[in-house]
Amino acid sequence: MITYILPTRDRPERLALTLGALGNLKGHPVSSPQDPGEVLIVDNASKFPATAPEKLANGLRVRVLHRATNEGAASRNIAVQNADPRSEWVVMLDDDSYPCDTGFIRRLGKAPQDVAAVSADIYLPGMSRRESGGLPEVFIGCGVAIRRQVFLDLNGYDPAFNYYAEEYDLAARMILAGYRIAFDPWFRVEHHKVAANRDMNTILARLVRNNGWVMQRYAPADMRRAQIREQRTRYRQISQKENARRGFTEGLLELRKTIRAQKRTPMSRQLFDRFTGLSYAREALQSAYTTKPFRTVQLIDEGKNGWVIRKALAELNVTILPTPHSPLPTPDCLVIGSMSPGPMLDAFERRTLLNPAGSPQRILAPWTAITRKPAAGSDILTGGATKVA
């Protein structure tokens, strides 16, 4: 059976819509005809306590766990602790996200035992794009299936993070424990995210502090300082774009106060290359180079961890030309410059639509999971489920 977990706070209308969507899902594997699974709602101290029916239209049982304070993402921990022990997997959602179908559940049952989590392909219908964030082996919390026992063994999310980058911390601990994170392109989740009323200063403050914590905890000793600088540069640029300089400054001050308190459990270089996506960029670009060598490229649609793509190209002795607006010669190919799955998929689909088969312009994605999507109904998981040396 399966357990769906979603935290909520002061959004009863949105919660009701999500429960309705979950109740419309068909085809849950059943432990008994009357018991297809459960939904655990964690009410993070709503002003008016959240309510829900005891069962949804498809028979999913529903329980509401009320918390006295807003525990942020760590409220998911109490839900997993209360999940039905028959559930091998727990599906993490938000109160505004839900799977489009149940086909992913059958594939979860065939996942290799060292796959601890399976990331979904998360769509934002209201914004006509996919969810940003994450990496090939870092999931996004509003659309991921996690082995219940692994989550419990690793003590779940660190409450100190509250929200933002807590998934990076948990994914790092999974990798250190010998597990992998996979990506299932047919595990589709809709996230009805609302951009309004978001305090970007608060968001930037947490992003700066929490991502700094992650690198302080897990980056190899000879890369730690550079990785913290990389995070600082990225979020300074975002703060300028989002007019959230105050939040950036507050986050930086908080990071400086707390960074020495973070326990160091550094990864080996090999594990860290998986964590950052460098292993996957190397694999994809080396494969493309072997198929048809190239000497010059331009980076397009640049985003998170673009530095690993530049490094993988440098290792191939490939020259990166300036932006397409430059009057320089046409590059041999265009390379998508983000390691975040959602933006990478969006860019690849958009660019290949503009440059159909037979076009002289070659488009490369820095992750083979993007270009080797298994057939519908396949049991194959991609991304982190492929071992990379």
Language model regions located:
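A conserved acidic beta->alpha catalytic loop
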Residues: 21, 40-52, 97-98
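Short, well-formed alpha-helical segments that are part of the catalytic scaffolds
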Residues: 11-32
